[in-house]
Amino acid sequence: FRDGTLLTLLRNSVIIALLATLISTVVGTMAAVGIHSMKGRLRSAVMTITNIPMTNPDIVTGVALALLFAFAGTVLKTNSVLGFWTLLIAHITFDLPYVILNVMPKLQQMDKDLVEAALDLGCTPFQSFTKVVIHEIMPGIISGALMAFTMSLDDFVISYFVTGSSFITL
């Protein structure tokens, strides 16, 4: 802990992991709720697309995102597009499936009558969502957030491909 450069790199890694975890947990939870309400083939197709980042090797995802960001830099006519924001977007993309797949089982286990009971007792739909649904799926949200943080902090390959020289992590 005496090397200042190493501490800066550790700080950068933790910042990216925390931000990616926070954003992917919120977005992933909302996505899981949306996917849970879908039916049939649409739900199956969305779940298949959700699993792609998990089934792809990290190097394929890293190269694909690097090409996407390079193309975006060409279109936007910016020289150094790779950096903090591209790394954050890549980590969010990488973390989202883990959050969704941790929240989905809790949504499937939840008793649907609880929401209707809350509505019957005078809650608004927003109140029933925040007080009943979120409360019921909280273990899935927490496990998804922990999984996202761990995966984001552990990831090297994707970070290597999508980070420019302006923002370096461990």
Task: Specify the residue positions occupied by each region the protein language model found.
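Hydrophobic alpha-helical transmembrane segments of polytopic membrane proteins
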Residues: 87, 168-170
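Low-complexity, Ser/Thr/Pro-rich intrinsically disordered linker/stalk segments at domain junctions
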Residues: 131-132
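Short loop immediately C-terminal to the Walker-B catalytic DE motif
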Residues: 35, 117-118
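Membrane-water interface segments at the C-terminal ends of transmembrane alpha-helices
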Residues: 1-108, 136, 140, 144-152, ...
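Gly/Pro- and small hydrophobic-enriched strand-loop and loop-to-helix capping segments
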Residues: 40, 124-128, 164-167
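Glycine/proline-centered hinge or cleavage motifs at structural transition points of membrane proteins
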Residues: 121-122, 135
